[in-house]
């Protein structure tokens, strides 16, 4: 069975592949491969979100790495993009994030970054997977003198906060702004509120008391209802919501409207173009990005390139084409001038700076950006359904979608989720009634085939 998915290793804790045994062997395999390539003892940094299972996985990875002669640097709860930054800042050889992002607390995962701050290549993931599954690995283990050590790094959050502040123009601040923040009881529960406070904003924080099981629970980027309520009640200028590992951000304007990644990407693109900093006047988005946004950017002289869903594909296209801005509707925004991955706190601060600089309310920044009606349905795949049958269901649904599209002024996207056992159906159409009818029809067909 395949261990690595589209975004590292992920699954329900204590169920394959998210078991202590697999994590131990993953740590051993990573360290072994690094030792073959490096002239020195491997140094590997480990960060995590706030899930209770993070302790289990952190201990297993640390044991695996140190048993193979590598040193481990433990930074505790910290956003995924902070690990990408710290890997470069601390000159270590690799970084590991223990997180299942927006998934419930019962899930967890492992993402690995190489020493340049980019996610591991598929080739290296395959090499690690082969060693995990190799019963004869490791044939030789280090002697007692060659074992690694584990160190706890106390100032990691402070380093990351100072880095984010450095992305703003010198002497700039956010004084005069009132900002509501929902870190989803996740990895940024201290960082984003502290960051905005140090920049001079008035900060109201909710869902910032993680207990190991409340991460993403009816809060954060996927459940913005409580943030909408607090923004309205406190008359905040806007609200910020992250997911569990804070690699994404969505905003809420002062009227309580959700400002997703499509809007954020558009505002950032226009601002960069105005400052002549948008490379090749191009942004990279995914197939999920709204057609209305694409048309709006086109009229503004900005080209959009689409990729498959997943920030790794956005990053790949950005590197290939030499672009510096990309993102997803879900709120993964990659500002390549500062970071190599989706970074929720950086996105939030950059947007706050634009709002203050232009002296506009967020609602005014988005009011002219058109959106075609769009709806998404997630169809759960039965646990024991073979992969071939899932592929067959998607194929038949896609054929049905092609027929339905002939009578639409829009599009249909059907794809398997890369992180959960679900089929995702997205329908976009200028006519909201037709959109609902098409979505209901496809859902009925999918449920019939999966029952």
UniProtKB/Swiss-Prot annotation:
Its cofactor is Mg(2+). GO terms for cellular component: cytosol. Gene3D superfamilies: Alpha-D-Glucose-1,6-Bisphosphate, subunit A, domain 3, Alpha-D-phosphohexomutase, C-terminal domain. Activated by phosphorylation. Binds 1 Mg(2+) ion per subunit. Transmembrane segments: none annotated. The keyword Aminoacyl-tRNA synthetase does not apply. Keywords: Isomerase, Magnesium, Metal-binding, Phosphoprotein. Pfam families: PGM_PMM_I, PGM_PMM_II, PGM_PMM_III, PGM_PMM_IV. GO terms for molecular function: magnesium ion binding; phosphoglucosamine mutase activity; phosphomannomutase activity. InterPro entries: A-D-PHexomutase_a/b/a-I, A-D-PHexomutase_a/b/a-I/II/III, A-D-PHexomutase_a/b/a-II, A-D-PHexomutase_a/b/a-III, A-D-PHexomutase_C, A-D-PHexomutase_C_sf, A-D-PHexomutase_CS, Alpha-D-phosphohexomutase_SF. The active site is at 101 (phosphoserine intermediate). HAMAP family: GlmM_B (MF_01554_B). Belongs to the phosphohexose mutase family. NCBIfam families: glmM, PRK10887.1. This is Phosphoglucosamine mutase. The gene is glmM.
